[in-house]
Amino acid sequence: MADPVPPASTAPPAAPAATTATPPPPPPPPPPKALRPQNQALRMLGLPNLPNKLPSRNWMIFWTVSASITAAIIYDRREKRRNIAKWRHAVEHLAAEPITDKLGLEQPRKLTIYLSAPPGDGLRVAQDHYTEYVKPVLAASGLDWEFVQGRREGDVRAVVAERLRKVRRGWENKEEQDPNREPTKDELIEIYRQQRGIKDYEGVRGDVVIGRHTWKEYLRGLHEGWLGPLVAPAEPAPLPPTPAPAAAEGSTSTEDKPAEEKKEEEAPKPKRPPQPKPYNTTSDYSSETLHPLTPQELTPAVPIREPHILGFLNTPTRMVRFFNRRSLADDIGREVAAVCLATHREFQQQTNPDAPSTDSVQYEQAKELEWEEQDWPKKVWKEDEADADKEVTEKIHIKPVVMDPRLAHRMRRFALTPEDEDRVSKIKVPEEEVEGWIKGSLRKACHWGYDKAFNKKKLVPLEDKDVE
């Protein structure tokens, strides 16, 4: 008989023996990559190493605005140089024309440049404006010119009037010839020319007037010189000085001696010559007579733009003009080219039936560059006798232009003809004349490399006779 199956054991299984082994440690991290050396200049500016992504929003705005302003300035300056070069090429053929007088006994054509300090500023501003826009075209034409510069209001008026009075005195032969008087520099030059038989230029000369303020003085000087008297009017007798009390003089005589001695020791500073007073006024034009020898056509003239505005609140206007100097260069170049080519026309006039009889005729001379008066400082329009400049004998800038019909019809204005306009429009300025320093340097470097690589000069062996 088989043995019975033993019953299953009900006792719990024995627990496994505890292990004393520990798990292995994790592998060490890889060594960090070596950082790129940082530019110290960028680090001081707060710029780390440039990442491989677009800059932030603020940086994008900054670079966009900076690039736009830089591009606008570069484009405007390049086009300004292009416009000036175009008008230079339009008149440069005049410099190549041969002189008709082979003996040199005829004076060349000479222009007169009138410029003065703009209201509220100095003369240097007008000189810089002339050098930047007017001089390049004049220099390319090969013409000669002279300057009339005014530092004070009325200086140009006085020079223009005195020159015309000198011409009238020569017609009437009423200029006093004092044998004991020393001749001036201009008179010595004129005497030398007469002795050598040098003739004056008989063609069209020309006057270039820069700025509305100078144009007003120029017109005032024309009327004073052609219509005014040849002798200065008598000045009113000055009032006798009132004597000071004797007691006050005795009490301060001992105290003022040291001050008087100091004043005598100091060298007196040279003073400017006084400005000549005008010989007539605008109300005298109608009652004055015009000399019968006055030419039917006066010397042609042209006013040149000189936009000049001051003040912090006018910054937007100044910024617009700063980015649009190319149009200013084109307008001034056109006017100066007309002067060089000696093409002129009559000044126009309009009739206004609604205006009073005295102002029914509007002359073009009075409207030239009238918009520039809006840019003048407010203090120019304040005519205060207490603060007025004692050296200025007449206020011309703030007064309206008064024209006499006899002179208005004789005046001529320089202007280009349609034929000249068509000829100038076909002028193409090469890029090499207007490009900047960076682009020009790159172009020269490329040309130099191309010549070195492909345009090698062939060396020709010398013969013995060439060496000897």
Curated annotation (Swiss-Prot):
<keyword id="KW-0813">Transport</keyword>
<keyword id="KW-0809">Transit peptide</keyword>
<dbReference type="GO" id="GO:0016020">
    <property type="term" value="C:membrane"/>
</dbReference>
<dbReference type="InterPro" id="IPR050187">
    <property type="entry name" value="Lipid_Phosphate_FormReg"/>
</dbReference>
<dbReference type="Pfam" id="PF11711">
    <property type="entry name" value="Tim54"/>
</dbReference>
<feature type="region of interest" description="Disordered">
    <location>
        <begin position="233"/>
        <end position="291"/>
    </location>
</feature>
<protein>
    <recommendedName>
        <fullName>Mitochondrial import inner membrane translocase subunit tim54</fullName>
    </recommendedName>
</protein>
<feature type="compositionally biased region" description="Basic and acidic residues">
    <location>
        <begin position="254"/>
        <end position="269"/>
    </location>
</feature>
<keyword id="KW-0811">Translocation</keyword>
<feature type="compositionally biased region" description="Polar residues">
    <location>
        <begin position="279"/>
        <end position="289"/>
    </location>
</feature>
<dbReference type="GO" id="GO:0005743">
    <property type="term" value="C:mitochondrial inner membrane"/>
</dbReference>
<feature type="compositionally biased region" description="Pro residues">
    <location>
        <begin position="22"/>
        <end position="34"/>
    </location>
</feature>
<keyword id="KW-1133">Transmembrane helix</keyword>
<dbReference type="GO" id="GO:0043231">
    <property type="term" value="C:intracellular membrane-bounded organelle"/>
</dbReference>
<comment type="subunit">
    <text>Component of the TIM22 complex, whose core is composed of tim22 and tim54, associated with the 70 kDa heterohexamer composed of tim9 and tim10 (or tim8 and tim13).</text>
</comment>
<comment type="function">
    <text>Essential component of the TIM22 complex, a complex that mediates the import and insertion of multi-pass transmembrane proteins into the mitochondrial inner membrane. The TIM22 complex forms a twin-pore translocase that uses the membrane potential as external driving force.</text>
</comment>
<feature type="topological domain" description="Mitochondrial intermembrane">
    <location>
        <begin position="76"/>
        <end position="468"/>
    </location>
</feature>
<keyword id="KW-0999">Mitochondrion inner membrane</keyword>
<feature type="transmembrane region" description="Helical">
    <location>
        <begin position="59"/>
        <end position="75"/>
    </location>
</feature>
<keyword id="KW-0496">Mitochondrion</keyword>
<keyword id="KW-0812">Transmembrane</keyword>
<dbReference type="GO" id="GO:0005737">
    <property type="term" value="C:cytoplasm"/>
</dbReference>
<feature type="topological domain" description="Mitochondrial matrix">
    <location>
        <begin position="53"/>
        <end position="58"/>
    </location>
</feature>
<feature type="transit peptide" description="Mitochondrion">
    <location>
        <begin position="1"/>
        <end position="52"/>
    </location>
</feature>
<feature type="region of interest" description="Disordered">
    <location>
        <begin position="1"/>
        <end position="34"/>
    </location>
</feature>
<feature type="compositionally biased region" description="Pro residues">
    <location>
        <begin position="235"/>
        <end position="244"/>
    </location>
</feature>
<keyword id="KW-0653">Protein transport</keyword>
<keyword id="KW-0472">Membrane</keyword>
<feature type="compositionally biased region" description="Pro residues">
    <location>
        <begin position="1"/>
        <end position="15"/>
    </location>
</feature>
<comment type="similarity">
    <text>Belongs to the TIM54 family.</text>
</comment>
<dbReference type="InterPro" id="IPR021056">
    <property type="entry name" value="Mt_import_IM_translocase_Tim54"/>
</dbReference>
<dbReference type="GO" id="GO:0015031">
    <property type="term" value="P:protein transport"/>
</dbReference>
